[in-house]
Amino acid sequence: MSPKNKYVYICVEYIYIYFAKIHKQSTLSSDTTKMFVLIDNVLAYLLEQDDLFVTARFAIQGQIVSRRVNKIHISNITDVLLQQFISHTLPYNDNIVPKKILDSMRTAVRQLLEATACVSRECPLVKRSQDIKRARKRLLSDWYRLGADANMDAVLLVVNSAWRFLAVWRPFVNSIQHATQELYQNIAHYLLHGNVNIQRVTALIQLVMGQDDLLFSMDDVLQEVFRIQLYLNKMLPHNSHKWQKPSPFDSANLLLNFRDWTTDNALLQELLLSYPTINKNKHKNHSVPRLIQIWVESYWQDSETTLKDILNFWYSHLAEYYEYQELFADIVQLFINKKRTRQLKIHYIGLTDKEIEENKPPLDYENLFLQYEIDKTNANDELCGATDLSDLLFQWKQGELLEVEAFALNVSPWSLAKTLTLLESSLYLDIETIEFTRHFKHNDTTIDSVFTLSNQLSSYVLETTLQQTHTISYWLQVALSCLYLRNLNSLASIITSLQNHSIERLSLPIDVKSDHLFQRLKVVVHPNNNYNVYRRTIKHIFHSQLPCVPFTSLLIRDITFIRDGNDTFTKDGNNVNMQKFNQITKIVAFAQYLQQKQYEDIHCSNTTARSLLGAMIKVHTLYNDNKDRAYQVSIAKVPRLT
């Protein structure tokens, strides 16, 4: 070993001794800053080495492989091979393997070869392994032979070669997992005890990852690492113990509502008290870590002190467990992307069909749509293909005034209804689960964006109807098309606007057919009997499992009504009134269920969407500046009788 390499080896050894020392003492010495500078220098040097400290480099290079690996969906290679082995030991007539089984066998081996080839190209240590080269060459040879000779002997040869190949691969995967655990522990210690800027930590991780582009975000790196780990774990499964998972509904019920009676830090302390830190068999109780993981991933709100306590808990008790490396990645993402609320992953609460009784819709809206013969043809919309409104909605959310030509209602009602539906659906799907219960405490949420779009649409319907009285029939056809598309939010905005006093006092002439349609659409969103008709309609849509945009303000109103109308604690004051929060969680579960379906078979023109949003913004600005505008325009049309 050269003097330079020996110096680096001593430095690394000193670093690990130092880590162990300060972890035991729980105190920091005065040379902490120098120590982290030394870590930076050592890690930078490691990038230049080919043979020395290869485990650290292998941990990273073996995981950040080509993104093509993520596109290969393999169920479980070992299970596939085992099934093939069992099936081929059964007697077959003439010793011929059925074509379907043979094709499945070829596909499984091909996917195994493709996946491992991606890793081999990116990982020098794997590339230099003669055992892997020999095992791969033998498997490749037997696989080619399988195409020409489809007898049982050829199949068993491939099975045997595949198992040998997997056996050679397994130690490398174990090394990746072990090295990654060490890497994560060091990063966690750096975050906990290093008095450094978070951007410096990000740059350090990117340096270790071998990324030249420092714009490559840390959370993307960690997500990529975890994706590859999951992939390799499926490809080469190891026998890990299964941890107990809390009920999805019970977890959501607690994590959605606990802030009504306690704080984030108080909840964490209660959870940590429930964790058996003295018991050596801590792995037998995984309910607490699992609940914390769900909390961090799906129900988190800004609380940096609590997040540091969770990181400390992970570092002290969970770092040695492979299944909790994802929790570490989640914590780091929240450290870097500081946001009031950030849903890293959706945990579905679950709602059974039995909880919502199926019934016939009070209004057969599909037949009603056919009766009024709405024209559904629009060549421009169909030619535009898949519609991506994300950039347009981002500009709209930022309050940018979209510079467009004046939007005239010359598009078909069907085309306008599709545009409204896709805009409303995009916003509704972006609502994070926790927003449904915490909306009343925060501003600038996605729910606020949904309300803003509804208000802008209401103002636009009101203005265009007052200025051009003949458009009332047009808007009724748009409303009917929205109902047919199950966009109940836009339907409510349009029908409510058309019932505004400023319009009704004009006594606009309307044909009998349109008036009949107006009366039938009014019933759907009428508040009579607590919106009975609307609720029966949405339940029918729920069971149809079709995409839908619900009347969002009614969802929030229901949650607010339950929260404000019921006591948080029981009458004796000793227990939390869980019946109240069960009702809230069921409403959120219902709202979340409706987010699982997307509109994939309808499209709209981006030009139409941009023009519509621009026109609605301009009109709504007029109504914000003058709250009496609608009445003033109405008076100008038909003066009051004196």
Swiss-Prot record:
Note: Present with 2110 molecules/cell in log phase SD medium.
Subcellular location: Bud neck; Cytoplasm, Cell cortex
Annotated source species: Saccharomyces cerevisiae (strain ATCC 204508 / S288c)
GO MF annotation list: guanyl-nucleotide exchange factor activity
Keyword Ribonucleoprotein attributed: no
Gene, per the UniProt record: BUD5
Residue ranges of domain N-terminal Ras-GEF in the record: 224-339
GO biological process, one term: Ras protein signal transduction
Assembly description: Interacts with AXL2, BEM1, GSP1 and in haploid cells with AXL1.
Residues passing through the membrane, by range: none
Protein name (Swiss-Prot/TrEMBL): Bud site selection protein 5
GO CC terms in record: cell cortex; cellular bud neck; incipient cellular bud site; plasma membrane
Keyword Zinc-finger: no
InterPro entries, sorted: Ras-like_GEF, Ras-like_Gua-exchang_fac_N, Ras_G-nucl-exch_fac_CS, Ras_GEF_dom_sf, RASGEF_cat_dom, RASGEF_cat_dom_sf
Source organism, top-level taxon: Eukaryota
SUPFAM superfamilies per record: Ras GEF (SSF48366)
Annotated keywords: Cytoplasm, Guanine-nucleotide releasing factor
Limits of the Ras-GEF domain: 412-640
Function: GDP-GTP exchange factor (GEF) for the small GTPase BUD1/RSR1. Regulates the activity of BUD1 together with BUD2 which is a GTPase-activating protein (GAP) of BUD1. Required to produce both the axial and bipolar patterns of bud site selection. Determines the orientation of division axis. Overexpression can suppress mutations in PRP20 which is the GEF for GSP1. May be a cytoplasmic GEF for GSP1. Might also act on the Ras-like protein CDC42. Appears to bind to Ras proteins but not to activate them.
